[in-house]
């Protein structure tokens, strides 16, 4: 019977400790080799939490699938902050260019509830609200209204 383990690991810095080691150890596979493989595959997401799915079949063959980090992590990396605002409505911790929001939306489009880029960008900007990040120097809610009004259609089509 195949086993599947889903974990969130720091990109490029997974260890054989929890949560990976205890989950894979009883399966009788080489945990260090799996961790090394995960680190190679997640190196580009260094410093971000990355979802990883590890599948072990009956013959102890391991398949590793790396997901895309959460939208919050991508926004924070793009802005260059370690942590979101404790009071996002009053304390602003950074500014995200609209082009970066579009780039993140394109990256995450398959994992989002949105079917169109425009609504995916709105989801990313909605994340900015909860992190305490402005978009193009404006409050995210203002940008959302502007997107709905079609003011950013040229950026969304580029």
UniProtKB/Swiss-Prot annotation:
InterPro entries: Ribosomal_uL11, Ribosomal_uL11_C, Ribosomal_uL11_C_sf, Ribosomal_uL11_CS, Ribosomal_uL11_N, Ribosomal_uL11_N_sf. GO terms for biological process: translation. GO terms for cellular component: large ribosomal subunit. Keywords: Ribonucleoprotein, Ribosomal protein, RNA-binding, rRNA-binding. Transmembrane segments: none annotated. GO terms for molecular function: large ribosomal subunit rRNA binding; structural constituent of ribosome. SUPFAM superfamilies: Ribosomal L11/L12e N-terminal domain, Ribosomal protein L11, C-terminal domain. Pfam families: Ribosomal_L11, Ribosomal_L11_N. The keyword rRNA-binding applies. The keyword Ribosomal protein applies. Forms part of the ribosomal stalk which helps the ribosome interact with GTP-bound translation factors. Part of the ribosomal stalk of the 50S ribosomal subunit. Interacts with L10 and the large rRNA to form the base of the stalk. L10 forms an elongated spine to which L12 dimers bind in a sequential fashion forming a multimeric L10(L12)X complex. NCBIfam families: PRK01143.1. Belongs to the universal ribosomal protein uL11 family. HAMAP family: Ribosomal_uL11 (MF_00736). This is Large ribosomal subunit protein uL11. It comes from Methanosphaerula palustris (strain ATCC BAA-1556 / DSM 19958 / E1-9c). The gene is rpl11.
């Amino acid at each position: 019977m195949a086993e599947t383990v889903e974990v969130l690991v720091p990109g490029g810095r997974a260890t054989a400790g929890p949560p990976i080691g205890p989950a894979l150890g009883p399966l009788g596979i080489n945990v260090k080799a799996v961790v090394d493989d995960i680190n190679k595959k997640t190196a580009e997401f260094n410093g971000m939490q990355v979802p990883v799915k590890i599948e072990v079949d009956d013959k102890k063959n391991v398949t590793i699938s790396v997901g895309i980090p959460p939208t919050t992590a991508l926004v924070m990396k793009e802005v260059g902050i370690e942590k979101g605002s404790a009071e996002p409505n009053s304390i602003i911790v950074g500014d995200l260019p609209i082009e970066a929001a579009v780039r993140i939306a394109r990256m995450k489009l398959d994992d989002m509830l949105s079917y169109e880029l425009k609504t995916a960008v709105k989801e990313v900007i909605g994340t900015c609200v909860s992190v305490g990040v402005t978009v193009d120097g404006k409050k995210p809610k203002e940008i959302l209204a502007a997107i709905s009004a079609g003011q950013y259609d040229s950026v969304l089509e580029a």
